[in-house]
A protein has these predicted regions:
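Short, solvent-exposed polar/charged micro-motifs at secondary-structure junctions
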Residues: 41-46, 95-96, 119-122
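Catalytic core of membrane glycerolipid acyltransferases/transacylases, capturing the structured
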Residues: 51-117
Length: 278
């Protein structure tokens, strides 16, 4: 009886609205530090007026909408845009859609299952391409909706290659949070903590980059999350910044200012000897 009740659409809608309110409360009561020098410079330099792909791991889904709220205030060109978040067609996707709607985000229903064979996957890809070709923003969790954790599906590389849109990778962490026993070890922020947002400079995936695009997204997302987690771990020792916290913040700033990767096409990568002779 109780299990049937928790799966009822009205119950899920109410629970999602309550979670959305909670996530908004946690975001507003957390003292955030944004590390995004390279990304902010690129957006203010004109990229904000065109298509943008924002990627973050599924485990940081509750920390994703807060980045948009923060960046929209820093980059005026982003203000009129409403990001489209890719979610699954399963009921958990509908649940997530209700949560992110609290932050002014919209949803595209599809999936990103490994191997590219997924219900609604091709339709979702077409929908995202339409958004990007119209100059919009698409947010994706490359390891969602079912994992494996921190393993990017091919779809994000394909989307970037087909659209030509720059990819921004994002990680965040807080000093006060819970970790769920889910496949992704989802992070739920608690109110009244401190947090770090790490947004890395954008990179473009060439049409023939192949596996390199997917691998780059995976590596950069993990680096961003690890940098944020290292800072949060150091910052938990007390309310005042210590040497460990300062060092972790400096490392995150260096990462966020690093030049983005320049991806070669698979054809060029397969001829290293010819490239060296040239």
């Amino acid at each position: 009886m109780f299990r049937r009740l928790t799966r009822h659409p009205r119950f899920l809608s109410l629970a999602a609205r309550l979670l959305g309110l909670y996530v908004a409360l946690a975001h507003r009561t957390t003292r955030w530090t944004l590390v995004a020098d390279g990304a902010t410079e690129a957006l203010r330099g004109g990229l904000a007026e065109g298509p943008v792909i924002l990627a973050f791991w599924h485990e940081r889904l509750t920390l994703g909408p807060g980045l948009w709220v923060t960046m929209r205030g820093r980059v005026p060109a982003l203000a009129p845009k409403r990001p489209q978040v890719l979610v699954s067609r399963h009921r958990d996707g509908v649940f997530i859609g209700e949560v992110v709607a609290r932050f002014g985000l919209e949803t595209i229903h599809g999936s990103s299952a490994k191997g590219g064979a997924s219900k609604g996957g091709s339709a979702a890809l077409r929908a995202m391409l339409r958004v990007l070709r119209g100059g919009g923003v698409v947010a994706v969790t490359p390891d969602g909706p079912r994992g494996p954790r921190r393993v990017a599906a091919p779809g994000v590389g394909q989307l970037a290659a087909l659209s030509g849109a720059p990819v921004f990778t994002y990680g965040a962490s807080t000093t006060r949070c819970l970790r769920l026993r889910s496949w992704d070890k989802a992070m739920i922020p608690l109110p009244f903590g401190r947090g770090l947002m790490v947004l890395l400079p954008p990179f473009v995936v060439p049409p023939e980059a192949g596996e390199a695009g997917r691998a780059a997204v995976e590596a950069l997302l993990t680096e961003a999350c690890d940098a944020a987690d290292a800072w949060a771990e150091a910052a938990r020792v007390g309310p005042r910044a210590g040497p460990g916290e300062a060092a972790a913040l400096a490392a995150a700033r260096a990462l966020a200012s690093r030049a983005p990767p320049a991806l070669a096409t698979e054809a060029a990568a397969s001829r290293p000897d010819e490239a060296r002779r040239a």
